[in-house]
Design a protein with these regions (language model features):
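Active-site core segment of subtilase-fold serine proteases
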Residues: 1-119
Length: 119
């Protein structure tokens, strides 16, 4: 994605919180745990604060974790990738794979920017 230029200017996501609205994120994933933000996370399907995906026999609910890694994966940890905004706080709202609703979350969580793309 050619982000090195932004990184060279000191842009790293510091001071920004990003929330992924998807099938959940693995909050304890080694690439995400350092930047995990519980205040930007919830599970609307089970009505609790744990954004971890529901894994079944197909093991298919990993999309949110992958998206979160592309945004805020920790650099230099001997794992796979570095996130584009590697110093951003990352949260997840587990809303897919169950009941879907989004409109009240912007107000409830006092977020200035709210975007949701669900295909």
């Amino acid at each position: 994605m050619m982000v090195e230029g932004a990184w060279n200017l000191g842009v790293s996501g510091a001071g920004v919180a990003v929330t992924i609205l998807d099938d959940g994120i693995e909050k304890d994933h080694p690439d995400l745990i350092r930047n995990y933000d519980p205040l930007s996370s919830t599970d609307v399907n089970d009505n609790d604060s744990d954004p971890n995906p529901r894994y079944d026999f197909s093991d298919s609910n990993r999309h949110g974790t992958r998206c979160a890694g592309q945004v805020a994966a920790t650099p230099n940890n001997t794992l796979c990738i570095v996130g584009i905004a590697f110093n951003a706080q990352i949260g997840g709202i587990r809303m897919l794979d169950g009941q879907v609703w989004t409109s009240s979350h912007k107000t409830e969580r006092n977020k200035k920017v709210f975007a949701s793309s669900i295909l």
